[in-house]
Amino acid sequence: MKRKERRKQIMNFGQAIEALKGSKKVARKGWNGKGMFVYYVPAGHFKSYTEIGKSIADKDDLVHYNPYFAIKNVNDTVSTWVPSINDCLAEDWYVVD
């Protein structure tokens, strides 16, 4: 028995940004990597562990960061992500379930 594939609503980058802000994961049909997706990381903080981190930490030893986009890579690692011009102009974005 074949599994039914759910139809994905295709979006432009502006719509993808709105989905990201709404805590959704998004990806592009044009990406070759299986399982890759982008998600929004809200502002927060982490404990400083490096000398540079300690030099900018607050009195509680925390480094504060601004919101950013992250990408889950094919090898299951995560990196910060900045869209290319091709990503910005693409109209093949979809929400990942």
Q: Which role does the model predict for each range below?
A:
Residues K21-G22, V63-P67:
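A short, compositionally biased
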Residues Y65-D97:
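Short, compact, well-ordered microdomains
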